[in-house]
Amino acid sequence: MADQVYFEDVEVGAEIPSLVKEPDSLQLVQWAAGSGDFYQIHYDPAFAKRNGLEGPIVHGALKHAFLGELLHQWVAPGGRIKRVACSYRGMDLPNRRLTHKGKITKKYQEGARNIVELEIWAEDANGKTTTPGSAVVTLPSRA
């Protein structure tokens, strides 16, 4: 985890540090067990291919969790994640790099709260955005 980020130090348009993940088949099975999502397209190559896929695909909700981890690593320990939303626009295969990124789109104060809005997304190994989203976080003040 990096040093604490403060509200006064962030600027609209700035990107936050990225998070790289390369989920493998074991992580997909572990996610299935934890989430209860045992749909075979996430772990059975033959089933995935019979359903028109190249092979098993990463759970969308796992990519959502990675985006949450990206935000947590950026705001912690003193900031808080208030909202995370994303949509699943592309299928990602296991054992391939996923890079999770964020860009500050707005910052403002609401009462005593220091609010930062971000565009967030996951990119596949080719740089294609497969999971676009948005987030709202609060950051501590230096004051």
Map each language-model feature to its residues.
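Hot-dog-fold acyl-thioester-processing enzymes
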Residues: 2-81
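Residues that form or immediately flank small-molecule/cofactor binding pockets and catalytic motifs
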Residues: 21, 91, 109
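HotDog/MaoC-like acyl-thioester-processing domains
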Residues: 1-16, 94-143
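Mid-chain, well-packed structural core segment of small domains
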Residues: 73-96
